[in-house]
Amino acid sequence: MAEVRLGENESIESALRRFKKKIQKAGILSEVKRRERYEKPSLRRKRKQEAARKRNR
């Protein structure tokens, strides 16, 4: 889990910016969006195969 500690003279806005960057790098937001709805295993395999094809081009 991403954790950000507020520095002595640090504003909340800058700490929030750092937190958002950490979450983006960790891929937490994209995973949450992906898990919003159930994905059938066959569709999951299909999506992974398409992603692999795009990477190998």
Swiss-Prot record:
Keywords: Ribonucleoprotein, Ribosomal protein. One of its GO terms (biological process) is translation. One of its GO terms (molecular function) is structural constituent of ribosome. Residues 35-57 are annotated as: Disordered. One of its GO terms (cellular component) is ribosome. Belongs to the bacterial ribosomal protein bS21 family. PANTHER family: MITOCHONDRIAL 28S RIBOSOMAL PROTEIN S21, SMALL RIBOSOMAL SUBUNIT PROTEIN BS21. This is Small ribosomal subunit protein bS21.
